[in-house]
Structure formats: C-alpha cells, structure tokens
C-alpha cells in the first residue's frame, strides 16, 4: 500500500519548481506504483475466470496481450493524491480495465479489425459472436464489481460513461463515409475514448 503520493514523490526528487515542470516523465511516476500495478494485474486475471472455457480463453487472449494498463494506472495515481492506495482504488482500476477491454472487443467487431495489440483480434479466431458476448461478459463483470463497492456516485458515473461510449459507437456507424465534419469527428473521439479517460481523475473511489 502506498502511503505517499507517487506524483509528489517524483516532484520531490527533482530540483527547482521550473525543473519539476520540465523533468517529470510518465515512466518515473508509474515506477512508484509498480507494486500496486503488479497486484492489480493479479486481480484482473484471477477474477475473470469462469466455468465457461471459451469465455476464459477469449478474455485471457486480450487481457494478456500486453496492454499498457494506462487507464487503471491513472485511477491509482489520482487516488494517491488524496489517500493511500488501498483495495477500493485497486478495484475501481480493475473495473476500468474491464470496461476498456470490453469496448475493444466490441470495437474490433464493428470495425472488422484483424489485429489487436500485435496479435490476431479475438473476432478473427473465435468469430464475431464469441467476441461480442465476451465483451458483454466483461461489461457485466465490471458493473457487478461496482455494486460490491457500495458507492452510488461511482456507479452513476460509470453508467453514464458507458452510455456515452455506446452513443459514440453508433455515431461513428451513422457518420457518412468520407465525411470531413470536424465537429462530428471530435464528438466521436470524446464519446468513444476521452470520456472514459476523463473519469479516471474525477471518480470517487472512497465508499
């Protein structure tokens, strides 16, 4: 468990205030939450196991494919600014990774993607049906975990965010091919990607 903020720890290691702004690198901050990220990785893999072998296979295929885990890392870093990183922030970070992974499985079907994270996309191996349903499972798993945290505000934030992400997917589907409407394009980016990233620094992780 972290007792001091990794962000503040890195700031204290550099020189003047001007140097602090120039010298802090993401990898230096992430290094300070290495033990927590290792524990998170164990949670992510262990808790996804089910009695349905195909679900296990598809979920492990994408979760073990080398993702950067940037979104859950942001959850932990944001939480560390206000309190030590205990189990609640770790579980929220886990939820965020499940949600993100679910969107990747769905997105690859919508886009007809052949690869994901330098390997064959799940849909290329097990088909669209298994890929979509595995994404649905991860989504359901994430919201089940949210209910165990007994934090209504957090549940509302996550519910609203996933609604916006679905709107973004549909907006992209309905967008005219070859359209150069910049406003619509930026709206799609916000709904599909940015809104999930923004909640990492705003979501309440305390019960």
Predicted stretch roles:
Residues 2-45:
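N-terminal amphipathic/basic leader segments beginning at the initiator methionine
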Residues 34-35, 39, 45, 49-202:
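Mg2+-dependent prenyl diphosphate-binding active-site environment of isoprenoid biosynthetic enzymes
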Residues 203-207:
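Short "domain-exit" segments at the C-terminal end of structured domains
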């Amino acid at each position: 468990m972290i007792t001091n903020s990794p962000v503040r720890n890195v700031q204290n290691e550099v020189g003047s205030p001007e140097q602090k702004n120039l010298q802090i690198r993401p990898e230096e901050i992430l290094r300070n939450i290495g033990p927590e990220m290792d524990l998170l990785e164990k949670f992510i893999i262990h808790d996804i196991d089910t009695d349905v072998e195909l679900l296990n296979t598809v979920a492990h295929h994408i979760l073990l494919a080398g993702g950067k885990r940037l979104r859950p890392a942001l959850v932990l870093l944001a939480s560390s600014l206000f309190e030590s990183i205990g189990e609640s922030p770790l579980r929220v970070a886990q939820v965020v990774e499940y949600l993100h992974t679910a969107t990747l499985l769905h997105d690859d079907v919508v886009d007809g993607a052949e690869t994901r994270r330098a390997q064959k996309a799940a849909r290329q191996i097990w088909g669209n049906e298994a890929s979509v349903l595995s994404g649905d499972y991860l989504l359901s798993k994430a919201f089940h975990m949210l209910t165990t945290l007994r934090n209504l505000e957090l549940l509302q934030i996550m519910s609203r965010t996933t609604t916006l992400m679905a709107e973004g997917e549909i907006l992209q589907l309905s967008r005219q091919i070859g359209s150069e409407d910049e406003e619509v394009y930026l709206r799609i980016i916000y709904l599909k990607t940015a809104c999930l990233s923004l909640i990492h620094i705003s979501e309440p992780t305390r019960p």
